[in-house]
Regions:
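Short amphipathic alpha-helical interaction patches enriched in hydrophobic/aromatic residues
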Residues: 1-4, 43, 98-101
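Amphipathic alpha-helical interaction elements
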Residues: 24-27, 41, 99-102
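Structural signal for well-ordered, non-membrane alpha-helices
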Residues: 1, 23, 61, 65-69, ...
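Conserved protein kinase catalytic domain
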Residues: 19, 36-39, 114, 118
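Hydrophobic alpha-helical connector segments
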Residues: 2-31, 83-90
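Generic C-terminal helix-cap and adjacent flexible tail
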Residues: 119-123
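Amphipathic alpha-helical segments used for helix-helix packing
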Residues: 13-14, 28-48
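Hydrophobic/aromatic-rich alpha-helical bundle segments in the mid-to-C-terminal region
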Residues: 48-59, 72-118
Length: 123
């Protein structure tokens, strides 16, 4: 990814950039991630669409893992978990927060999840 390979972009800035679409979606109660919506009906999707949805999530996981590895190497992040495991936690928590926020109309849910995740990087 260009952001993780660009030495002028900090890992924290890349992570904040990653959060932006989630925050944009979370500002209203009527939007969620399209792939999260499709994943909810994954088995009913045609095989080609299943592959694309899986690719979307796998690309996001790989990108987050790159950001976390970069941040750890540069001393921006301090965590003991495997970067791959944290990437899964981030994607799962962000996607879940969008869905729960939509159902509960609690629009602080996503911001609370993002704060909790970023605090995790300082442990």
């Amino acid at each position: 990814n260009r952001l993780t390979n660009d030495e002028s972009v900090s890992a924290r800035d890349a992570l904040n950039f990653y959060f932006t679409p989630y925050q944009d979606l979370g500002e209203t109660g009527d939007k969620i991630c399209l792939c999260a919506s499709l994943a909810g009906e994954f088995m009913a999707l045609p095989i080609d669409m299943q592959k694309e949805v899986a690719l979307f999530f796998n690309d996001h996981l790989a990108w987050l893992e790159e950001i976390l590895v970069k941040g750890q190497k540069l001393g921006e992040f301090n965590f003991t978990e495997k970067p791959k495991d944290l990437a899964h936690l981030f994607v799962d928590a962000l996607q879940g927060a969008l869905i729960v926020q939509r159902a509960t109309q609690n629009f602080s849910q996503l911001d609370r999840i993002i704060r909790t995740l970023t605090v995790k990087l300082k442990s």
